[in-house]
């Protein structure tokens, strides 16, 4: 049995011929078949994967970067192999012949299409309690949620069923499950990764993102997807990182607060300067942009997708087949009652989104900051079966709102962000730290993430 490690470590082992690609695949298949209770996958084809591994072993990688590394792709991403179901009944037979561009780029670089990842239905939720494929369960405690909507991909990476994966992120959907499952989640600057071949939620915000075991792996996949040359090691000496205490550090679970402060203390010894500075009006502006834009764009974007692909099911039929009551109610409310009017949507895009963008730009420039750092999620994973509210720190709280609170604001203006696991609570649940930077600062964010990862040594404190 091959010991499953990071993509980067596995590539080194394959190049040294410590084991074959087929050996690697057999280990992943064996682990996956022993972990079906986690519901990580929406679809698999182990025979196809074995054949692909044999092809790599016969022909070699030709020097191509990913050399037969199997990846998991969220079920709303066209692979050309698995149905692009988006986790919903109405698309179970939808199988575009042409893979998404991001799949093509990774496959051209030698990656294998390992599995289709379970997801929250139509990406419209954060628990990944999918009524068709079952709830994706957290490998750290199987009674708990994985987070979503890219939960199956995060589970597959955290449980060593796949070496890495591609999810999608509208407001939190890559970084949230990564944080709850104790792996790395990266949302790039909006527009850096292609979105062709992906079932949409909100085209003005949707982007593919990375879920991997290490920041080194995120750097590797990012370089391949963006077709960019490796960058030289970036000096972090003298970097200024903002700590926006108001909002982002408010009302944290005690163990999350303690773990976050412990990580910050460790990082303070790494020649980086921390600046306590708040982002003004961030909660109010986010509220006026986030859900109004997503809820208004979603039905229109999905109708356009169905029309483009000539899918037999009508939009109404697809909606009637939604299995998740909360997703169904939200979509039906928009369709039947006009939950978000066009005027509210236009005001969000033309007024409040530019204000949010200007607020962030002024925050960085006026404080001389290179990036900001804060807890990825205010709380740890909770039991499967969550309702619309939960009790958080003794107060009944909106479930969706509290889980995405810290991750959502910058997503509305397309900034790059990275969630890195930094600690385990005493009951061994992961806590993540988010690093965000200005528009286009992906390399800087990843470099800081590597420093965080090296300093905190996740999982070794208990």
Swiss-Prot record:
UniProt GO molecular function: hydrolase activity
EC number(s) stated in the UniProt entry for this protein: 3.5.1.-
Species this chain originates from: Allorhizobium ampelinum (strain ATCC BAA-846 / DSM 112012 / S4) (Agrobacterium vitis (strain S4))
InterPro entries (UniProt xref): Amidase, Amidase_CS, Amidase_dom, AS_sf
Descriptive protein name: Indoleacetamide hydrolase
GO biological process, one term: auxin biosynthetic process
Family, as annotated: Belongs to the amidase family.
Record-linked PROSITE patterns: AMIDASES (PS00571)
Keyword Metal-binding annotated: no
PANTHER family: GLUTAMYL-TRNA(GLN) AMIDOTRANSFERASE SUBUNIT A, TRANSAMIDASE
Pathway named in the protein's UniProt entry: Plant hormone metabolism; auxin biosynthesis
UniProt keyword terms in alphabetical order: Auxin biosynthesis, Crown gall tumor, Hydrolase, Plasmid
Role summary: Hydrolyzes indole-3-acetamide (IAM) into indole-3-acetic acid (IAA).
Classification of source organism: Bacteria, Pseudomonadati, Pseudomonadota, Alphaproteobacteria, Hyphomicrobiales
Pfam families: Amidase
Active site: residue positions: 74 (charge relay system), 149 (charge relay system), 173 (acyl-ester intermediate)
